[in-house]
Regions:
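Extracellular/periplasmic, surface-exposed regions of secreted and cell-surface proteins
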Residues: 3, 48, 249, 255-260, ...
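Immediate N-terminus of the mature polypeptide
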Residues: 279-281, 287-290, 340
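N-terminal, polar/charged subdomain of small-to-medium soluble alpha/beta proteins
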Residues: 384-385
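Short, small/polar-rich motifs associated with maturation and membrane association
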Residues: 1-253, 258-267, 273, 346-347, ...
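Flexible glycine-rich, low-complexity coil/linker segments exposed to the extracellular/periplasmic environment
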Residues: 146-203, 296-331, 447-458, 462, ...
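Proline-centered flexible-loop/turn and helix-kink motifs
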Residues: 13, 18, 186, 296, ...
Length: 685
């Protein structure tokens, strides 16, 4: 991850693991990155894998303030705050069989991250200092292929409008200057307010700049026979290719472990990250009164040279070629701005006790605290907010605490047989608070706080709490280190499900056979061969507050608080979702492991899905969440790795991944023909 020089640890995984789909929501600095493994298995539930950092779960949720219709910015995600410089290792568990060990939240797979501060081990006396520094540049990757023969207008007649349906550029010499520019800066147009009618081939490209990323870190590590420590400090600054966009991250972490004697080992680590993100409005904005710097940017009139002329008057008012349809992007990037400051603290402490050489007791408790403060400004003069200005003040805080107790038995019998059994208990609690206040119509220009707005409305004030408890058992039987059979079972209890369905059980069975060892097939050409099979069933709970009819507090009326019922009816008979998956695969290594092939076929079916069903108006509600539907994901994954060159101090490794996943909705509820997952003018599901 460090070698990749990518400030987002998920983006560094792009193309590295077959079956893992990684996509960025926006191209701006710090923008959220979504990860999906083997397709979507739920209509409305979270389809991202569980992220575990040093034993502590971490949500990759993207907290949005405005949607893509009204504006929308390049909001960051949960993993944007993870410092790649502190990552020691990262592994991806793709199959549902992993869920029995990690709980129902792992139904979409697991990404396990071990940091340097969280993976210290004692050993020989040592002390080390590692410095990393990188500088990289970025430019906008692609733009449409523009024509430069025809200008703006309709039916080959000139008019100041978007598109290129007007006359040829070689058919006219001059046209009237744009009204906004002529009124604001008449001195720029001395020839009777006329300008040349000519194409500007790079008028879109010239709006952008060359971005750069500075990333510096220092790592200290040391230890002796009994203790070890590790500490990392890093600073990253990303200036984007969109003007006035950027992302800063300062991260520090420290961890260590020590042997207390009598088989007891104490370990712990803590990390703190502060991020500061800034960017414009980048949303859809094809509706009236919305704010987006990209409303018309990608299909400007071919003669609109926005970088040649000022984009604002001396008092800050916008100037553009067609004010009624779009904000000048250069003005918008300066004035319509979203700034987000966030802090994340992840800490864990654990105790390991080797009772005997074959029995170990381990307990880990950790917490993850995330706090965010965001200001979203639509400045005076924008076509949005009626031109009067708007400020959205958004605060959010999430606290997640998890504890895990493991009893591990591991012993060999009669030289050829091995047994490993894990009995565990897991407890998880998540709390979230969120407030969102919108102030409209600035009293005084250039002062961006709620006290400077004439009207304030609390558009959101949320509190959410949920708990998930589980017990699990994992048994692995081995024979001669080439045949393995595994059994896993877990039972969870979720606070988001009704009492009669709160408890749900799910098992898994896996097997693997290393035939190259069993039949002694190793040679210079063929080194390793393994076949693996697995079946798993995993349950998943609902989001909070689907069970009962709940009420919300509205705006006061004549001093009295107004309470209104939710548009969703409660359903006290909700059941968990279930996913069954069958997986078959093989791993083959050739030519002293310089060529390897990994192939997997899987078939995953999800049932009992939790989704809304429309209700008749006479019910007094709009919808109710219920269990219905069936989704199938079926596909193959191929990973090919080769080492063309390997000498003493040099190794060149190349890899190719291929994934094919077919995602099908097999069933809906009787009488339900379609479910709207997203619309043209709404966020993508």
């Amino acid at each position: 991850v460090i070698v990749a020089g990518e400030p987002d640890m998920l983006k560094a995984l792009q193309g590295k693991v077959a079956g893992v789909d990684i996509r960025s929501s926006q191209g701006g600095p710090g923008s959220a990155t979504k990860i999906n493994i083997r397709g979507a298995s739920s209509f409305f539930g979270d389809n991202e894998p569980l992220i575990i950092v040093d034993g502590v779960p971490l949500s990759n949720q993207q907290i949005t303030t405005s949607n893509q219709t009204s504006g929308g910015s390049n909001y960051s995600g949960g993993l944007s705050s993870i410092d790649p410089n502190d990552i020691a290792s990262m592994s991806v568990l793709k199959g549902s069989a992993a869920a029995a060990m990690y709980g129902s939240r792992a139904s979409n797979g697991v990404v396990i991250i071990k940091t340097k501060s969280g993976s210290t081990t004692s050993g020989e006396k040592r002390f080390g200092v590692t410095l990393n520094s990188s500088l990289s540049f970025e430019n906008i990757a692609n733009l449409p292929e523009y024509q430069n023969t025809y200008g703006p207008g309709f039916a080959f007649k000139y008019s100041n409008s978007n598109g290129s349906w007007g006359p040829r550029f070689d058919s006219m010499e001059k046209i009237p200057a744009w009204e906004d520019y002529l009124n604001a800066f008449p001195e720029l147009f001395p020839e009777d307010g006329m300008i040349p009618y000519e194409a500007v081939p790079n008028n879109v490209k010239d709006l952008f700049q060359t971005g750069h990323i500075y990333d510096n870190s220092v790592n200290l590590s040391g230890g002796n026979e009994k203790s070890a420590f590790n500490a990392t400090l890093s600073h990253m600054k990303h200036e984007g290719y969109i003007p006035n966009s950027g992302y800063k991250r300062v991260a520090m972490s420290v961890g260590g472990s020590t042997k207390l004697g009598n088989g007891i080992n104490l370990r712990g680590n803590i990390s703190y990250t502060n991020t500061d993100q800034k960017g414009g409005m980048y949303g859809e904005n094809q509706v009236s009164g919305a704010a987006s710097s990209f409303a018309r940017t990608l299909f400007l009139g071919r003669n609109w040279d926005l970088t040649k002329y000022p984009y604002e008057t001396p008092d800050g008012k916008p100037v553009s070629t067609l004010t009624s349809q779009y904000d000048n992007p250069l003005w918008s990037w300066k004035h319509n701005v979203t700034t987000t400051e966030a802090d994340r603290i992840i800490g864990s402490i654990g105790l390991d006790y080797d009772v005997t050489d074959w029995f170990n007791i381990s307990y880990t408790i950790g917490t993850n605290v995330y706090s965010m403060y965001r200001k979203e400004v639509i400045d005076i003069g924008s076509r949005a907010a009626e031109g009067k200005g708007q400020l959205t003040d958004h605060k959010a805080r999430t606290v997640e605490t998890e504890s895990t107790l493991l009893l591990t038995f591991e012993k060999d019998f009669f030289e050829d047989y091995s047994v490993k059994a894990i009995l565990g208990h897991n407890a998880n609690e998540r709390k979230r608070t969120e407030t969102l206040v919108v102030g409209t119509e600035f009293k005084v220009p250039n002062i961006y706080n709620l006290a400077n707005t004439k009207n304030q409305v609390v558009s959101g004030d949320y509190y959410e709490k949920r708990r998930l408890m589980g017990v699990f058992f994992d048994l692995t039987l081995g024979y001669k280190s080439w045949a393995f059979l595994g059994f896993t079972a877990r039972n969870d209890w979720s606070s988001t499900l009704p009492k009669n369905h709160r408890s749900y059980f799910y098992p898994a069975v896996t097997g693997s056979f290393v035939f190259s060892d069993a039949f002694n097939l190793q040679s210079n050409m063929f080194n390793f061969g393994k076949i693996r099979v697995g079946w798993a069933k995993v349950g998943r709970d609902a989001d909070p507050y689907y069970l009962y009819n709940v009420y919300a507090l509205g705006d006061p009326f004549r001093g009295q608080t107004i309470t209104s019922a939710s548009s969703s009816a409660g359903n006290n008979n909700l059941k968990p979702e279930f996913t069954e998956e069958v997986e078959v695969g093989t791993q083959l290594d050739f030519f002293n492991r310089r060529l390897s092939l990994d192939f997997t076929w899987y078939n995953k079916i999800s049932t009992n899905l939790i989704a809304p069903v429309q209700l008749p108006n006479s019910s007094g509600f709009v919808e109710i969440y219920d269990n219905f539907g069936k989704i199938r994901n079926r596909g193959i994954e191929i990973g090919l790795r080769a080492v063309p060159v390997e000498i003493k101090d040099f190794k060149w490794e190349v890899g190719v991944n291929f994934t094919k996943n077919k995602n099908e909705v097999l069933e809906l509820k009787e009488g339900v023909e379609r479910i709207a997952l997203a619309g043209v003018l709404t966020d993508l599901a």
